Amino acid sequence: FNGTDGDVRVFTHEIGHAFQGFSSSDDRLLDCVWPSYDAAEIHSMSLEFLTYPQMDKFFGHEADAFRWNHLAGALAFLPYGVAGDHFQHLVYDNPKATPAERHEMWRSMEAKYMPDLDWGDIGYAAKGGRWQFQGHYFGMPFYYIDYTLAQTCAMQFWLACEEDQAAALERYVALCKLG
């Protein structure tokens, strides 16, 4: 933790994983205690949204700004996540691609999915090197799309919470108990 609003995001995200693990720990089917990778991020990303009502306690009069920035970031993440998945398919379909060709593949993904992105004077990123920042592509190939799918599920919990917070929390707890 470093004293920024990111601490709250990371904390609520990781607590979502922990709460899910605790909630399903009594399940006799070991495969149901921990969800598959494609489902695991739903619990954590959803809790980020479901804790919006408590953000006043962290941020006081800046809570609305936090919520807006978090939501904007979540929305902006969707095309980035899709671009990353598409890029990985291109890389694996072209295993002999040179570094320059991989950079060009990434630039084409940025142009397709994030057409307003402008790296300005950040040369390496502008030349297509930004994909190398994402460690998931190296350590857990094809996992990043799971974050994207989970984000859409989490946004559904946010919308449900906007309508009826108690009902949304009940649905969330029920989901966590399923593993």
Predicted segments with their positions:
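Acidic/His metal-coordination segments adjacent to aromatic residues that form catalytic metal sites
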Residues: F1, S24-P35, H61-W68, G129-Y137
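Short pre-active-site segment immediately N-terminal to the catalytic Zn-binding motif
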Residues: F1-T12
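Single, functionally critical "micro-switch" positions that shape active/binding sites
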Residues: T12, G16, A40
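C-terminal, non-catalytic "cap/extension" segments appended to globular domains
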Residues: F11, F19, S46, K57, ...
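Post-HExxH zinc-binding segment in Zn-dependent metallohydrolases
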Residues: S24, W34-E62, H70-L71, A76, ...
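Catalytic Zn2+-binding segment of zinc metalloproteases
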Residues: G16-L30, L50
